[in-house]
Amino acid sequence: MKNIEKLERSLTYEFKDKNLLIHALTHKSFKKSYNNERLEFLGDAVLDLVVGEYLFHKFAKDAEGDLSKLRAALVNEKSFAKIANSLNLGDFIFMSVAEENNGGREKPSILSDALEAIIGAIHLEAGFEFTKTIALRLIEKNFPQIDAKILIKDYKTKLQEITQGKIGQTPQYETVRAFGPDHLKQFEIALMLDGKELARAIAGSKKEAQQMAAKIALEKLGAL
């Protein structure tokens, strides 16, 4: 048995039904007939509502489109994995030896899913309002500055607006290579403009590498 009491202290919530928490921590590789996927589904919906309601009140004058971008910047695998890491969640997940040897305890997807499952489990046991308190505390701790300019770094859109306006060209993003083990895959992206390479970047996902390349291009153009 893992020391789940330590995790409960980090969550500031003690489960009445310990089996519910164990269920939320059980990856499908450990036991296919008993895993956290259904709780993950529930937790995803709960977090979507929690963050949506929070942003609705915090940014009372912002348009729907801006609120949607903010929510997307918070409700995603990368953000949830960051929160999960702050809880050392990887230490508590039940998974197969094969998955663990493949870096499963550090995989953002597994960490994110487990966090969602825990939120779903708390919701089942304690209700929405209590779960909202815990979820917002975790979010605000890991993202102390919930600000559109900080969270929404859409360099690709900004670059495209500039290049289309000035030269009538749309930047193209080409995958140069993908390398590294599955749990630490890296992607190298080249940003092409009018047939010439303007910038290049490497990151853990294609989207992130594209944004990084766009940022480099904007810096070269003096637009940042």
Swiss-Prot record:
The DRBM domain is annotated at 154-223
What is the disulfide pattern of this chain? Answer: none
Q: Which cofactor(s) does the record list? A: Mg(2+)
Q: What class of enzyme is it?
A: hydrolase
Spell out the molecular function terms from Gene Ontology: double-stranded RNA binding; metal ion binding; ribonuclease III activity; rRNA binding
Whether Phosphoprotein counts among this entry's keywords is no
Q: Which residues form the RNase III domain?
A: 4-127
Name the UniProt key words of this record, in alphabetical order: Cytoplasm, Endonuclease, Hydrolase, Magnesium, Metal-binding, mRNA processing, Nuclease, RNA-binding, rRNA processing, rRNA-binding, tRNA processing
Query: Where does the record say this protein resides?
Result: Cytoplasm
User: Per the UniProt entry, what are the Gene Ontology biological process annotations, in alphabetical order?
Assistant: mRNA processing; regulation of gene expression; rRNA processing; tRNA processing
Q: What residues sit in the active site?
A: 44, 116
GO CC term, one of those recorded: cytoplasm
Q: What reaction does this enzyme carry out catalytically?
A: Endonucleolytic cleavage to 5'-phosphomonoester
Give the residues the record marks as binding Mg(2+).
Answer: 40, 113, 116
**What CDD domains does the database record attribute to this sequence?**
DSRM_RNAse_III_family (cd10845), RIBOc (cd00593)
The record's section on HAMAP family has:
RNase_III (MF_00104)
- Record note on quaternary structure: Homodimer.
Protein name per Swiss-Prot or TrEMBL: Ribonuclease 3
**What is the native source organism of this protein?**
Campylobacter jejuni (strain RM1221)
Q: What is the lineage of its organism?
A: Bacteria, Pseudomonadati, Campylobacterota, Epsilonproteobacteria, Campylobacterales
